[in-house]
């Protein structure tokens, strides 16, 4: 073996070692790709399972429609319109979907009702993404205390949603503190404490006789700053009976946050129960008037057969769903993915 061969072996290893290293790199890359594909598959399976009721209802109604009609005509579109409204899609959106379907049917000269399935799925997708970029990420940055304000009525799944988001952030290596700002319900504070302990988050609760949510938030900010937390998640009261009180409470919390942390809150998320349908849209309007909102957490999607509420919220409230509840387990609160949602909702209609 010559000098240069020896020198190369010293610097870069023997030929066999170089081949082994190269093979190891290839295997590591393949492993990473496999892990990515597995995560994607698991996410899709979560959507399919969580949307099974909506999917079953959607498929059933589409097939009923196709069995009833031999051709695509005005009567067919009237029945399709009724079906989409029954799926909790707003009347305004349904009219847009119907008009778009009519255009495509006319342009492609389609007469068989069985050929319209893919068109419907495509229109659901394009309407959701029209005039805006779908953004489901949380506004979280390094080297600052990130504040997430969470609002919603009692019983919407607010407590569990806060805990599940905390768990996701903790799993990402973030240090998370929860402020129990629903001071009007002792049971809500106790439940949040139990969940915080379960997911490994710290929590600030009201002191004895402390009924002002803003005071709890004030203390929580000081603790979060002094102990270098990455995330502060603020729970709030969910009383809609008195809109003026609700607006005043949220306004005061927002003032406290802004005075202590520039640009806070960085996220203001509204928790809505998907099973409430159009009532959820009414709730969203009230909360939007009470505090600036950045996104929606849509819970209990696994419990409804009307999956169209996602589209209605975006159209009528102008907010994207950032998280969607697809089951009771901690990992069943998923970051909203439009592709997986449309697939989970319409899976099987072309089979």
UniProtKB/Swiss-Prot annotation:
Swiss-Prot/TrEMBL catalytic activity: GTP + H2O = GDP + phosphate + H(+)
Entry membrane topology: Peripheral membrane protein
Keyword Magnesium: no
Enzyme class: hydrolase
Keywords: Cell membrane, Cytoplasm, GTP-binding, Hydrolase, Membrane, Nucleotide-binding, Receptor
Pfam families in alphabetical order: SRP54, SRP54_N
Residues involved in GTP binding: 152-159, 235-239, 299-302
Coiled coil: none
Localisation: Cell membrane; Cytoplasm
Biological process (GO), any one: SRP-dependent cotranslational protein targeting to membrane
Gene3D superfamilies: P-loop containing nucleotide triphosphate hydrolases, Signal recognition particle SRP54, nucleotide-binding domain
EC number, as in UniProt: 3.6.5.4
MF terms (GO), sorted A to Z: ATP hydrolysis activity; GTP binding; GTPase activity; signal recognition particle binding
Family: Belongs to the GTP-binding SRP family. FtsY subfamily.
Function: Involved in targeting and insertion of nascent membrane proteins into the cytoplasmic membrane. Acts as a receptor for the complex formed by the signal recognition particle (SRP) and the ribosome-nascent chain (RNC).
Protein name: Signal recognition particle receptor FtsY
Source organism of this protein record: Metamycoplasma hominis (strain ATCC 23114 / DSM 25592 / NBRC 14850 / NCTC 10111 / PG21) (Mycoplasma hominis)
Classification lineage: Bacteria, Bacillati, Mycoplasmatota, Mycoplasmoidales, Metamycoplasmataceae
């Amino acid at each position: 073996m010559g000098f240069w061969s020896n020198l190369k072996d010293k610097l870069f290893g023997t030929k066999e070692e170089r081949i082994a290293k190269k093979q190891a790199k290839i295997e590591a890359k393949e492993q990473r790709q496999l892990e990515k594909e597995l995560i994607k598959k698991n996410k899709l399976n979560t959507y399919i399972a969580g949307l099974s009721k909506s999917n079953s209802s959607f498929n059933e109604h589409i097939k009923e429609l196709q069995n009833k009609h031999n051709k695509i005509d005005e009567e067919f579109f009237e029945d399709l319109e009724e079906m989409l409204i029954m799926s909790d899609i707003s009347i305004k959106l349904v009219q847009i979907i119907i008009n778009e379907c009519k255009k495509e049917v006319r342009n492609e000269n389609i007469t068989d009702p069985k050929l319209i399935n893919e068109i419907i799925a495509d229109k659901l997708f394009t309407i959701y993404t029209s005039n805006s970029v779908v953004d489901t990420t949380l506004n979280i940055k390094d080297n600052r205390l990130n504040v997430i304000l969470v609002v919603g009525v009692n019983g919407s799944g607010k407590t569990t949603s806060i805990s599940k988001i905390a768990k996701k952030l903790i799993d990402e290596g973030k240090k998370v503190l929860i402020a129990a700002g629903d001071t009007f319900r002792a049971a809500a504070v106790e439940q949040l404490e139990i969940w915080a302990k379960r997911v490994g988050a710290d929590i600030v609760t009201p002191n004895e006789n402390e009924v002002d949510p803003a005071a709890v938030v004030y203390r929580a900010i000081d603790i979060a700053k002094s102990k270098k937390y990455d995330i502060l998640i603020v729970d709030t009261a969910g009383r809609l009976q008195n809109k003026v009180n609700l607006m005043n409470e949220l306004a005061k919390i927002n003032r406290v946050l802004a005075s202590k942390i520039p640009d806070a809150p960085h996220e203001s998320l509204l928790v809505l129960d998907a099973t409430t349908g159009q009532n959820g849209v009414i709730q969203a309007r009230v909360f939007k008037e009470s505090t600036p909102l950045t996104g929606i957490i849509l819970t209990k999607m696994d419990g409804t057969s009307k999956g169209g509420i996602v589209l209605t919220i975006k159209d009528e409230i102008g907010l994207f769903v950032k998280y969607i509840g697809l089951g009771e387990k901690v990992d069943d609160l998923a970051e909203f993915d439009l592709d997986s949602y449309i697939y989970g909702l319409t899976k099987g209609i072309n089979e």
